[in-house]
């Protein structure tokens, strides 16, 4: 019997290490409509050619490994391998490049964000030849989009459920975020909803701690919702956080919320995980619950401009996994959010079709096919003086979330809610009349103060509050 080495030689196998670019750098490749496309910001180690780094990213996130293996001959690498098909230097940076990589559709399990991310943002981010690597954008092909359910309901269905049209929605995160008893928590919920808000929200930190177990919180919040609805004649909701230590416990909390008859629940999709989030989204569609998504942990992943994952990619992942709301930053509050970049991923959340626009950080044209849109949630250090800018920036299909900007009102929670509602309706009316909120917004708010003492008091408290810092992540 011939030695194994002779058999390998006859089959064309040659052991050893060869440059990735010999196999995975293919600048002549014609991208297919079914491909998943990725734009990576690469910082190669000194002395490593960008072509080799781009090819390494394509290889290590698809079929490649560090050495030639004889089992390559048992499959079709041309069919399954990722390809670095283009490189471009990053303007203003000495050693950064955008590497464009195309992945065949068959590399990914249908309907699984978990599998998609395991491949594309897996071990390759620890690759030694790279000093830093950031996933800037993904193009999700229509063929792959059609394997996902997406949002449980979407923007239009939510408006129909709430019977609220023609303005943005108002919310408030209950503060202090930790330490309240369930009864006192429910009292704050009632006061905010009674004062004019559409929603109140569990802070992402609130799960089921010793000071307030989840079942008690759900019961007192449901009581608050029904009382506020009866007194205002409006449909109200509270984002009951179903996030838990296990998927089974998460679904148990969702079931209890459904039994209480509340309209909406909440999940932390990054800390809870994509698999758990997708399971919850399926449950919510089947049972008529809206799903509010918080992005706790996102800044660990997306804030550094040369390493990690840009939030526009995390937003796309959520649109696939499923959620009716997603926190998106504010541009004007205390949390990170550069205007054009924020508007770029807000459009990616809401619109069915978004054209490539590098001025807003959108690297690929994205067609979402029939996936429902996700409502952006603006929250973090915002108050009534920000309302003109928020209405101008986000339009009507957004939820404006005032936590301290409601509960910090000098007269209490209900007046704080009333101040926000008056400010929102005044700005919406002014916009509808053709007024320029960017230029006249302050005048609109001051005019409304004349007939709303609650708004006047809020304006006096927060007239000097600003959060003006340079953004860390810029184009």
Curated annotation (Swiss-Prot):
Residues 1-2 form a propeptide. GO terms for cellular component: chloroplast. Its cofactor is Mg(2+). The keyword Mitochondrion does not apply. Substrate binds at residues 123, 173, 177, 295, 327, 379. The modification N6-carboxylysine is found at residue 201. Its EC number is 4.1.1.39. The keyword Nucleus does not apply. Binds 1 Mg(2+) ion per subunit. The basic functional RuBisCO is composed of a large chain homodimer in a 'head-to-tail' conformation. In form I RuBisCO this homodimer is arranged in a barrel-like tetramer with the small subunits forming a tetrameric 'cap' on each end of the 'barrel'. This is Ribulose bisphosphate carboxylase large chain. It comes from Nephroselmis olivacea (Green alga). The gene is rbcL-A.
